[in-house]
Each structure stands twice: as C-alpha cells, then as structure tokens.
Amino acid sequence: MSEIRLFVTTTEKQAAAVLDVMSAIFEEDDYAIATMEIDEKRDVWEASVYMMTDEEESVRSRLAQALEVEFSHLPIEREVLPDVDWIAKSLEGLAPVRAGRFVIHGSHDRDKVKPGEIAIEIDAGQAFGTGHHGTTAGCLEMLASVARSRPVRNALDLGTGSGVLAIAAWKLLHVPVLATDIDPIATRVAADNARRNGVVTGLTFATAPGFHSTTFSTNGPFDLIIANILARPLMKMAPQLVANLAPGGSVILSGILAEQRWKVLAAYNGQNLKHARTLWRNGWVTIHLTR
C-alpha cells in the first residue's frame, strides 16, 4: 500500500491558514501535516496532509468540506509517494546541529563533537525529532537559557518523539525527567535513544495521551515543562498543562508557526502565565513562559 500526499498550492500566508484548518480537522488522527516553500521569489508554498491510499477518499472529502468556505479556489492536488525511508534519506549528509551548548549528531559524526559540548546522538528512526528542525533547535537553546536563570528540580517533556529534548534536559540539569508521547513507537524509540546516550537512570518514559494518565500526578508537579507539538493542541491543553506546573515553574512551548504566536500566548496568559522570551527560527517560534 502506497502513501499519498494531498496538498494545495498557494502563498505563504494562505498556506499557514490552510495548515491551521488541517490541524483542526485532523487533530484526533495520526496524519502528518506540513507546509513547504516551493519558490521563494514567487511566494509559492504547499500545505500537505499525508495518508495511506485506502484513507485518501475520506481525507479528501473532509479536507474539501473544511476548505470550501475560505479556500474553495484552491484545488486539492495529489501525489503518490515512492516507497522510501524519507527520514533516513533526509538525514543523509546532514551536519551536526548546534544549539547553545548542545550538539545533535548522527553516529557517523561522533568525531565532530567539540570539548565542552553536550553531545546527543540521534540517528534516523520512526520518531520525530533529530534536532534539525527549527522547533527542536529552538527548544534546546531555550532550555539552556532557562537552566541558567531558574532552579529546576524536575522536568516534563510532553510529546517526546525521539526523546532528544528529554535527554538534553537530563544531561544539562541532572534532575528527574518524565518523557511522554501518545505514540508507543515514539516512547520505545526515545527510551532506546536514551540508553544509546548513556542515560539509564533519571529518565522515565510513558505512553500517555494528553494529561489523561496518573503518571503526571505521580511524577509532578514539574518545575519545567517542555512541549514541542503543534499550536492547536498546545492551546487546547493549556489548563491541564498549567495545572501540572509547580509554583514558580517554567514552560517552553514550540511547534508554533510565527503567525500563531499571539493565539498561543493568549491561551497561556489566560492561565496566568507570564511571557519571558520568544526565539525565532525559520518561521517557527519557541516561547518561554513563567508562573
């Protein structure tokens, strides 16, 4: 069975708006969504959703219905994707990523780690998060900044993916870290990556949808919560996330497009958190808030 990409071609601004629509209608599904720049000079972008061939008819119908009010002029195009390990392929030849004191590298680049750097080795796998995306790098840089300015006794990495942020938090802070994900594959991959990086104690991994698990009350409240997911779920879970934050604690949020920043800030200001800092990387933002 092949993988299909359904997409619309438009401007950067409209692609971001279409991505918001996709996030809303596919929030409870496991479909990957993304925007991609096609032509910088002509401001041509694509907003895409990925699925298997047997799901195409249903996804197309839902997408067309959601787009017909504001974006009916944008045709939904289709591409059949070849059977390629895109994660592995995309990492071929990628240089190590440096963010603050952290360097994220593949096993083929161990010799490029410099003295004094905090090295985290992440190879291509089934879970998201290699450090090459602006949101992951932004979280790493913000983590280093928070560690310099505020005491942290424990931390939560919500939506851990490959585990890179949880591993980074433990290596930098040396405090108990809980790492959760809704995907059991991600949880397993993250635990494997932690062991590969020599982190065998101090990190707890759990498969948990949102905050509907006793693992949060058992391990929390948390001095630091890192959530690198998407803007819409971040806004939706703001009350539950803040309920698990310790007094005086910090929150690092990412997976947020620059134009979505104000909506996310409004959701967390409504929970009495204060904006401390925003980092900008390649159209994405990472936000630090405090209690």
UniProtKB/Swiss-Prot annotation:
The keyword Cytoplasm applies. NCBIfam families: PRK00517.2-1. GO terms for biological process: methylation. The keyword Methyltransferase applies. GO terms for molecular function: protein-lysine N-methyltransferase activity. This is Ribosomal protein L11 methyltransferase. InterPro entries: Ribosomal_L11_MeTrfase_PrmA, Ribosomal_PrmA_MeTrfase, SAM-dependent_MTases_sf. Methylates ribosomal protein L11. S-adenosyl-L-methionine binds at residues 136, 159, 181, 228. It is found in: Cytoplasm. HAMAP family: Methyltr_PrmA. It catalyses: L-lysyl-[protein] + 3 S-adenosyl-L-methionine = N(6),N(6),N(6)-trimethyl-L-lysyl-[protein] + 3 S-adenosyl-L-homocysteine + 3 H(+). Its EC number is 2.1.1.-. Pfam families: PrmA. SUPFAM superfamilies: S-adenosyl-L-methionine-dependent methyltransferases. It is an enzyme of class 2 (transferase). Its main location: cytoplasm. One of its GO terms (cellular component) is cytoplasm. Belongs to the methyltransferase superfamily. PrmA family. Keywords: Cytoplasm, Methyltransferase, S-adenosyl-L-methionine, Transferase.
